[in-house]
């Protein structure tokens, strides 16, 4: 610190008196430090200290000293003076959310530690940073902020390498904040971004880590510029790519899913084929988290062959079906099969069994272990190995018994398909995704998986997995220890061990039903004398005779500290958390009966006819009751569930239920056992014996199976004999008695009861769906016993025959060996045939299985007669679905064994010469790719230069691959991150890492040749030869590296992967709010923000990717429904001619001539049409409705957060003061009043400064709010109709200033209504009323004044003062109820209701001079689904200061009735649909009028079709009537069903059809025009009054277009006007639309397969027209005689989601049922996938693909 020598002696002996009267010596250094922390420059320090010290005197107080310093500082720098006065110093907020003083020493130390900087440099930078920070006017600093300034200084001083090492990983604070806010605040039903936040952040961070920390700068730069491509960057630091499995080690030694056996159970070697299948699937699942790419099981059918010997073909097929479903369900679990968030499940950690909502449980784990989450697509997966030992209740489907099984993984994702609610007649229900499997019985009595839509019944398991540990007469520890303290009353004693008696269990049940805790005691609510006597007797006899038991009017109470603590340890307090003690669940039958008896005595109901019901609001107790009742053999139904949010009336007050109430009804024939344990006599007497249950279940599904397996039949049983009667449990018991040997089989059925289904319905669902993965059984039950199945890129390599290298190898089975694999050739063939048959059948709806990839090895015997039938079947599968791949093992360059992945990576047995070592238990470590076209651009026609650049790029790839090799090796063997891979068998690691391939890939050979030679591969032999030369160079380079490094280097083919003017408004959805923005402002904002990622193309066109901003646009989907879709790009084009389109309704939009709007064509399809092609009288589409926002309240304290002068009143404020006293004391320091005097004032007045306490108190606790000293108003405001009315009234007749809000009107009724609403919402103190004379209208003018608090809050809400600028703030464009009230308030204020009975005209008009208010009123009406017309009343000719008045006119019966809650006659409001009258006419003309009358009873003249034909449209109302009439005629429905369905879809969609009034071309051409791109739908809403508008629409190709534009244009594929569609041809393939024969294609591509030893493939595209198995077999036979090594037949597929039919080609409509809900599939790189997920480049390539001539 600086010393002030001139003053040191003078002030050294001075004392300063502190506020607590203590004396402290004046310290110049201390003064200097506080000045520096306040921001004083070092140069001014001496001057300030000198002046202050000159004024200091002995005995000065701290306040006086502070005033002196402040006055001195004020003359130099007012901001610094304020910092000093307010105690603002440089503070740093740490990651732990604590604050600490800034310390530049930490910067210096960090630089030395992280970057290796020398001390002098580090301190120099630290000093510079401190100087910069002093200049900042911020409340606090953050570590990232300081780090960025340090980096800036490092660059300034030329320390680039140090800056590189010091860079912070992650995304900008703004971006992460946006993502988190969207994730936590946005309503899920408003289409929250389907990409996972965790996935986005994790991938971006790991990619940055790879480019900054793994790879040196020159490699990272080469990737970023597009010279090379580093694939899988997000996994560069953690894992290899792919793996070929060998199942033998697991069949011999067993399976450790975690690789160690420490965190999961260890499975013994599989003895049974079912277990072997499960182990095969689990091997894939266990390794998946260790690989970034795919996995394959080589020789799959060979390894499994020994397990199926002696089995029938049907059994083998069933096993293969099980395997395929296992793989697909595991795969889908990472993205498809899941349960709704609120489904109740059992979770056991330690000894505690909890019942919890699956979503809450998984979210809690995910939040706790977020750094361990793995993201696969949009599915988040958390493997629990090494994290937590979690169990759930699962069912062994063989025995039917419930077991505790370990949960090894949990997952969640947003649903991509439909969500169903399955409701049983027993009252249970479950919400599942369309692909989630539940269980049903099949006809053989097996519990099998079925999807929701195929369910015949709901299986509920009634079995308790607990073993009996406690019995009546045992003792249980109370943990009570008596003390000899004189204060210990005898009545507090209880035994140290409490005897378990019937009465104890009854009391526990009674307490769970009606008990609560009081201070050190128990209260049981009851008026029943029997219960009161029972409690007194139990307490005196079994707890302590000295306890005083007191009876009150409605309760019985006693105090005993020991028993109170015992109960608290076992039972929760509140009703919604009540539970059964754990020892009851583990108790014997009598304990459970007694507990239930007590429960029924309290919270049960026994009807006069003997029905017994139990009521509970506790989800925990619901699940435990399921286990208790199950153990007692008592089945039950849930007769009623009172839903959360339901309104109930208590003492004439209506309140909302904030919990569910479950009503459990026990089967009548089970209740008699409970009778001795029920306490009240009247309940006990009502329980009567019954020999029947009343529950809706039925075992008829297994009746035939039972008839087959029973020796002795229960012939005297009516249900057994009759096919119509339900088969019940009593019949099963008779069968069991007659056939004791079937006891286990019958017991399985008794424990798993098939309840009838009441309904399966599709529901709207918000948010994530969830799943568990459970060891062994792969299933779990819900809290009511419903049995659920739980839910990897995979391939299998298959043999038609046992290969030579395996024939003599011992065949492994069940931990030993039996013969050799050569002995099992027939079994291997049967497995292959069964797999083909299963894949051919598809799933339950006939859809193809996407996994595993199906790879057939063709050896020399493939086409022999004995294989002919099987080969035909395989090609049938190719013809039907295009699934199989083929490896050609016949060329000379293929060796003993070769295997492949569907993505083309390949292993061959030529590394060590041992086929097993070279091709099994190893795979591709990584491939990185060359951009070949760019090398050609840079070589500019010079061969020598081309190969020089090629060599340089290969050197870069080599270095990158060597780095990845060492990093992965360290992760495997040093960090032990992948124990499954490194587990040892016979002394050798399972994963043979040293045998993995390091691979050079390449993209765009065809385009390289086109640029370099001027010819493509298919155009000349010279091009092919030069292409071979290039790939040979890469191969020779790789072979040379093998010798140099001793590593395995290979080469592989790599797969390549109109507008509006500036001020036109569009509608967007951001941060859970609708906003109307000018498209130009919107686009320019993001073009400026992301200049570095913007792409320029064509004639000054520029676009930028903004999907990560999480901004949405309302948009219509293929069904005509308005949905919210992400905006992916902001786009700017060079200006063009602008067309202004005005509709008859007054709505307008301005677009360029080539920008499209929407209409319908003669086929009733919605199509786009360019503005320049429109004409007056055409119909275009506008939205009928816009989705509402589920926001039902606001908190005013949140609206004014971070603003001063607001005061609040807090609930339980005295408790709040006590809890936060130290922080409050510090916060209120600036007050002159001392804390000890201020504290009682706060306690008395309950008035806290909001800005001082807002971070300490939850918004729910703030009851009132005030600005300054104005009157308080309510803090929580419901967004209901009344508050909407108030806002509407203000918008129409109100204004505000700095002192108040005023709403005035001459309408007394309007004012009175408003006063009533204000009192209810804001409180009686919020307003005043005055009456003024209105001279203009000779009426009293009533003025409501709202206090200053309301005025300030209106300002914060965005409610403008001036009528010309008013608008509905975005935050208030929310739910329909609020908006309906707003419109009503506006109508009563500044609207009018127009009635003309003679013309049947009934309309509403809203008036405003504000354009923004007009637009937001229109938006509010759209959210309400109300249509309108727009017009303008021109400003007064008398007074030019008057503004134009905008008029919104609402007509239409449905609109007005909806808005005003009135009933009116139809007034012909226009809601019409063009074109459909013509379609109805076509149907009518098929019959004469007489036929219509006589055959169908329809007078067609009454349909008024001819009138509609003249008009060119038909009203929606009439169209619906005509449609219903026609659909009710069976013949018409059968003949024209599809057409009528299409008409119905148009009638029921969210679109309006409005006629064009005028089109004009504007004189002025703007400099720029703008557009946005919307994901999936490619349309958005904009213009005055809202109109639906269309939007315009490989990495290497796009980057080359950016950096080598002219060169790229000459060779690139795709649409130059759509930069995202640009692509290069995959690797060494000929281009997809080359005009050549298949033979020519083979002859070109076969040249490259032997050279690409790390992977290759030939695609035969679009085989739909040649999908004949015989033709494909013939092609296959011919290809095996060439050098093509690996190929597949790709068939484009369309699968109907309604009826399940699969169709060849990419179709928009099902050829079977006419549905347009069609999924389209094709092959990308190597996998069949839904093309909707493809990027534009791949979709463009798909458009270009052609089948070569055969």
Swiss-Prot record:
This is Uncharacterized protein MJ0832. One of its GO terms (molecular function) is endonuclease activity. InterPro entries: ATP-cone_dom, Hint_dom_C, Hint_dom_N, Hint_dom_sf, Homing_endonucl, INTEIN, Intein_C, Intein_endonuc_central. The keyword Nucleotide-binding applies. GO terms for biological process: 2'-deoxyribonucleotide biosynthetic process; DNA replication; intein-mediated protein splicing. Residues 14-101 form the ATP-cone domain. This protein undergoes a protein self splicing that involves a post-translational excision of the intervening region (intein) followed by peptide ligation. Gene3D superfamilies: 3.20.70.20, Hedgehog/Intein (Hint) domain, Homing endonucleases. GO terms for cellular component: anaerobic ribonucleoside-triphosphate reductase complex. Residues 507-634, 1286-1426 form the DOD-type homing endonuclease domain. PROSITE patterns: ATP_CONE (PS51161), INTEIN_C_TER (PS50818), INTEIN_ENDONUCLEASE (PS50819), INTEIN_N_TER (PS50817). It holds the Pfam family NRDD. It comes from the Archaea. Keywords: ATP-binding, Autocatalytic cleavage, Nucleotide-binding, Protein splicing, Repeat.
